[in-house]
């Protein structure tokens, strides 16, 4: 935002017009829309009043602010039921599968053994019920993009687990030029709206009444994670650490060692004496390379968050949950100028909570699936599905590093095209690196070892025959297998 535009807003030049626009949107609408427009106005004010991060104020976290998961005490199985009775699990289910060519919710993509992300999430909760006789509520925070489709299949799970779902806020996109809302009323086309990021989870829990319900039922902690993180399961050691400390942290963010593949993700820093999540979008342009340094910023936010429910309620009642505004700029539908989405991240709220800490966990608790390259890894024999519904590295691999997989261009981007190109998933137990580009197909019972690079030239095709073993090979050019 330019200095002149910010000064104009702060002096009241545009803000009254924004308020009028929001009042028009809320006119003749229900209380939910009115509340959401008020919440958006508060977010808009935060955006206007926000100041660029002062890089000189960023420092390293004191050692006591990051606890090693390996230092936690093991939990006796006899204590599990009582501990789990204090827990609510919430999965963030607002995303579509567009990055993998799917139109519906990402959570309904089939991942492994004919199970979707949502099936695996339910399996995790069902396991707790079967093993420990613990009824842990599963809550799904949907967006307006995913709510209807997810609601249609809710009945499949209702006999297995206690499942709740709600639709997070729907906020108006704004014009980058005028900073005024795009929609004219509450019924404007869906392209005029956006879900404002997972930082909306706290206010949405309050608005839906679920926060009060769970507190009244004696629940104490909320475990939040992305539904496409197949390693994010309820962890008894972390829960025990929270419940049985004298002065427990009100907020724990699970972090892992940062690698070069994680450099765009958030990290934890000491800012003005407080623990804070620092995201790439907040970094000054001239400091981006420094931010990407894994030797300087060594930990990475998994977005697995443990939060005290009463603390959420206390802070919301005093309007004390403040989060940095993330500005997401996009081309307007139809290509007519640029629009802005104002978003917040759930992890950014940690600075508001007492005794907030990071907890360094094994990388096995962070198995996200964002692309078909990730999907290939999860579908392969590199991982096995455990009884508790999580994926773990196959013990037969012998070492814990995950292969680097790059499935290039449009031939593999969409799930349907990706599946059409594999008659079955190759044996990848000894794979280190796989790059595939161009028109390439794979037969059955293929084994990939070491570094394998397969590049089909333009207008040519490579068919990898069934039974092939490729170890430290580069395959290029044209290789067709035709029916006789």
Regions found by a protein language model. Give the residues of each.
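Active-site-proximal structural scaffolding
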Residues: 89, 111, 118, 143, ...
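Residues immediately flanking
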Residues: 93-94, 227, 309, 372
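Conserved short loop/turn motifs at secondary-structure junctions
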Residues: 137-146, 227-230, 363-367, 371
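Conserved core of the sugar-phosphate nucleotidyltransferase
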Residues: 148-320
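Glycine-centered flexibility sites
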Residues: 94-97, 101, 197, 266, ...
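Left-handed beta-helix
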Residues: 1-85, 240-484
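Conserved N-terminal catalytic core of the sugar/cofactor nucleotidyltransferase
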Residues: 1-91, 99-106, 110-221, 430, ...
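Short capping/connector residues at structural and topological boundaries
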Residues: 101, 105, 113-116, 235, ...
């Amino acid at each position: 935002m330019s200095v002149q535009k910010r000064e104009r807003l702060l002096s009241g030049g545009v803000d009254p017009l924004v308020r009028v626009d929001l009042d028009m949107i809320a006119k003749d609408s229900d209380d939910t829309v009115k509340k959401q427009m008020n919440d958006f106005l508060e977010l808009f004010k935060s955006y206007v009043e926000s100041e660029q991060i002062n890089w000189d104020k960023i420092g390293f976290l004191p050692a006591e602010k990051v606890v090693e998961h390996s230092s936690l005490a093991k939990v006796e199985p006899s204590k599990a039921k009582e501990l789990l009775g204090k827990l609510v699990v919430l999965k963030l289910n607002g995303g579509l599968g567009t990055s993998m060519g799917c139109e519906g919710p990402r959570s309904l993509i089939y991942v492994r053994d004919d199970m979707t992300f949502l099936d695996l999430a339910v399996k995790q909760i069902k396991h707790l019920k079967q093993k420990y006789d613990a009824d842990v509520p599963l809550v799904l925070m949907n967006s307006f993009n995913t709510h209807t489709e997810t609601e249609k299949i809710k009945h499949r799970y209702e006999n297995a687990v206690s499942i709740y779902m709600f639709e997070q806020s729907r906020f108006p996109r704004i014009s980058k030029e005028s900073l005024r809302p795009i929609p004219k009323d509450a019924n404007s086309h869906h392209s005029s709206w956006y879900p404002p990021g997972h930082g909306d989870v706290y206010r949405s829990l309050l608005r839906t009444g679920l926060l009060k319900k769970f507190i009244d039922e004696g629940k104490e902690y909320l475990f939040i994670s992305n539904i496409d993180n197949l390693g994010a399961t309820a962890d008894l050691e972390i829960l025990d650490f929270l419940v049985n400390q004298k002065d427990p942290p009100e907020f724990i963010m699970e972090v892992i060692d940062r690698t070069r593949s994680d450099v765009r993700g958030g990290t934890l820093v000491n800012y003005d004496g407080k623990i804070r999540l620092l995201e790439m979008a907040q970094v000054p342009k001239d400091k981006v390379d420094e931010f990407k340094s894994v030797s300087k910023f060594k930990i990475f936010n998994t977005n697995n968050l443990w939060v005290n429910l009463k603390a959420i309620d206390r802070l919301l009642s005093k309007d004390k949950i403040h989060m940095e505004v993330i500005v997401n700029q996009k081309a307007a539908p139809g290509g007519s100028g640029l629009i802005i989405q104002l978003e917040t991240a759930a992890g950014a709220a940690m600075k508001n909570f007492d005794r907030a800490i990071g907890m360094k966990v094994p990388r096995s608790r962070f198995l996200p699936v964002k692309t078909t390259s990730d999907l290939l890894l999860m579908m392969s024999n590199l991982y096995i599905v455990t009884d508790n519904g999580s994926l773990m590295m196959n013990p037969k691999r012998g070492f814990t590093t995950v292969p680097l997989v790059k499935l290039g261009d449009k031939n593999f981007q969409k799930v349907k095209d990706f599946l059409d190109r594999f008659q079955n998933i190759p044996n990848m137990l000894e794979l280190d690196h796989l790059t595939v580009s161009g028109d390439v197909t794979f037969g059955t019972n293929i084994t990939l070892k070491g570094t394998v690079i397969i590049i089909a030239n333009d207008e040519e095709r490579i068919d990898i025959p069934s039974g092939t073993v490729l170890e430290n090979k580069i395959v290029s050019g044209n290789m067709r297998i035709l029916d006789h």
